[in-house]
Amino acid sequence: MRRYHKMEKIGEGTYGVVYKAQNNHGEICALKKIRVEEEDEGIPSTAIREISLLKELHHPNIVWLRDVIHSEKCLTLVFEYLDQDLKKLLDACDGGLEPTTAKSFLYQILRGISYCHDHRILHRDLKPQNLLINREGVLKLADFGLARAFAIPVRSYTHEVVTLWYRAPDVLMGSKKYSTAVDIWSVGCIFAEMINGVPLFPGISEQDQLKRIFKILGTPNVDSWPQVVNLPAYNPDFCYYEKQAWSSIVPKLNESGIDLISRMLQLDPVQRISAKEALKHDYFKDLHRPSEFLNGVH
């Protein structure tokens, strides 16, 4: 760790503490110190293997993992440093982002996800806090692959409950078959939040989360989602809700935007659009280079 000088603590994420630091060459980076639950066992070798794979991910919309430093009891991941995230930006922009900015960010999120899915790596915990943005308006996904390496804890390093707001209904209902569709659900939730300025499904428990989802998308049944009856938490007595029109949920979205979000936020994971398909959607046909309309992101 002598190569890095800690400058300040910048956050406490799901897995541990994050510091802003400087290396011997004067470059700024982010150090993510991973907390290990099993104090006696040290770092699981599977985790180190998984993390090493992430060093091979190189894409403009993925936060670069520069280095991995591990001792017996501590694992430190060294990432490129970005000083803004989508949550901070949304908090500062009352009423949602400009439509062109939201479109650019969504496209970049999908590019990063498509790349990772092509490499068979899932995120499983996408949320505005781990979508980082630089001063040129380039968006990068952070924490890809960490869920598989360390499992997503119920409570974070600071004992805050890890958010359920972006979690897919199949996962909430106990599905262990994680597929690329779990990330697409999260992206759909983030898309709605960028447009509306508020979270789409701000649940306070797993049950409340499902209820909020069903209130908008309708209560699932065997016809709409054939596999739902096989999920551990499926309850045939779920309160019945009618599906609502997307135009009333995201009124600022145009027709092609509504079509795209409706394909992302399908209850049945099999029916969700893939990242690769989403990138070809009509919604993006008028997209220009990101930097053209992101001069307001600082």
Swiss-Prot record:
This is Cyclin-dependent kinase 2 homolog. PROSITE patterns: PROTEIN_KINASE_ATP, PROTEIN_KINASE_DOM, PROTEIN_KINASE_ST. The modification Phosphotyrosine is found at Y15. The gene is CRK2. ATP binds at I10, G11, E12, G13, T14, Y15, G16, V17, V18, K32. Its EC number is 2.7.11.22, 2.7.11.23. Pfam families: Pkinase. It comes from the Eukaryota. Residues 4-284 form the Protein kinase domain. It is an enzyme of class 2 (transferase). Gene3D superfamilies: Phosphorylase Kinase, domain 1, Transferase(Phosphotransferase) domain 1.
